[in-house]
């Protein structure tokens, strides 16, 4: 997942015309695959009302603010632009340059987690609560579509419009809609790849500008698959890194993930509910949607994810514990 030819000021090698032609053919295949994936989603999921009802069910709704990178036309962008934040009604409440992120984002700490909980500085930390008064935000495919006014490529724009038409307009708060949003982005990425590889400047041999001074501080932001990714570095007079601050995609979503798990558990487990393996799977769905990597990062060697659910009564006493993994 990490580029091996990145250097200060650029990259170590450009692409040749022969390589460009190979990439062009790959891009065509990628575009067809993206269209196929969306068609498959439509045929298997959208044409099955029970699946649509599951996506829209209250157990998987988490009402938050949203953050994402947009271009000058407020279209989704993965690498450049401004950070845009919208509220629970999809109204813009903040907009800032990536380098100014510390003026807009703060992190809350809980004693039971190594991972911090980012929130919007202008609203403040109000706890693990949903709604318009909460400072919690989400950053992921769902968020990127919610903060944007559209997609920068034609087919992805059509898919974007269908997404919101089907799910009732903006913003979409359904956690399970994350999968559909990811497919819309896949189509955009494939179209964009095809555009870039046909650009006449793509084979320009000038791929690096040697830095002429020692850096002292830098902030970089991209949209990773799991959300907005902030990298912040400070260096000494020799260019050695002395301080690093990272807010990665999963960290942005830490509080919403916790809230989504709680919401799913509360929505699925009622008085008299028999807790089964299938019910554990449906709770698990609430956080796997945030990032495909969570499916890999939270499992044991045999392939099962270690999960424990404790059922408590109104007094907080544990009535039953179910675990696996």
Q: Model-derived features: where do they sit?
A:
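Active-site and channel-lining beta-strand-loop segments
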Residues: 219-250
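Active-site bordering "gate/hinge" segments
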Residues: 1-226, 250-325
């Amino acid at each position: 997942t990490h580029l091996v030819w990145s250097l200060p000021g650029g990259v170590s090698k450009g692409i040749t015309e022969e390589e460009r032609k190979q990439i062009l053919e790959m891009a065509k295949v990628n575009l067809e695959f993206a269209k196929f994936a969306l068609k498959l989603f439509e045929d298997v999921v959208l044409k099955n009302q029970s699946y649509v009802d599951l996506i829209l069910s209250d157990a998987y709704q988490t009402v938050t603010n949203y953050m994402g990178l947009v271009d000058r036309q407020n279209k989704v962008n993965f690498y450049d632009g401004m950070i845009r934040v919208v509220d629970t009604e999809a109204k813009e409440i903040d907009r800032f340059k990536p380098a100014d992120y510390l003026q807009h984002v703060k992190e809350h700490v809980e004693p039971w987690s190594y991972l911090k909980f980012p929130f919007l500085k202008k609203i403040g930390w109000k706890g693990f609560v949903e709604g318009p008064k909460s400072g919690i935000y989400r950053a992921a495919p769902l968020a990127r579509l919610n903060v944007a006014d559209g997609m920068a490529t034609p087919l992805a724009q059509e898919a974007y419009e269908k997404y919101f038409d089907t799910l009732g307009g903006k913003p979409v708060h359904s956690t399970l809609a994350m999968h559909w949003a990811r497919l819309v982005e896949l189509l955009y990425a494939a179209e964009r790849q095809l555009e870039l590889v046909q650009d006449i400047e793509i084979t320009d041999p000038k791929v690096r500008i040697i830095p002429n001074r020692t850096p002292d501080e830098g902030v970089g932001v991209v949209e990773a698959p799991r959300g907005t990714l902030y990298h912040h570095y400070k260096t000494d007079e020799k260019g050695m890194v002395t301080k690093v601050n990272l807010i990665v995609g999963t960290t942005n979503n830490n509080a919403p993930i916790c809230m989504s798990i709680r919401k799913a558990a509360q929505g699925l487990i009622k008085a008299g509910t028999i807790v089964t393996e299938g019910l554990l799977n449906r709770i698990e769905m609430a956080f796997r949607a945030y990032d495909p990597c969570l499916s890999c990062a939270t499992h044991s060697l045999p392939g099962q994810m270690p999960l424990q659910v404790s059922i408590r009564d109104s007094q907080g006493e544990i009535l039953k514990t179910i675990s696996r993994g």
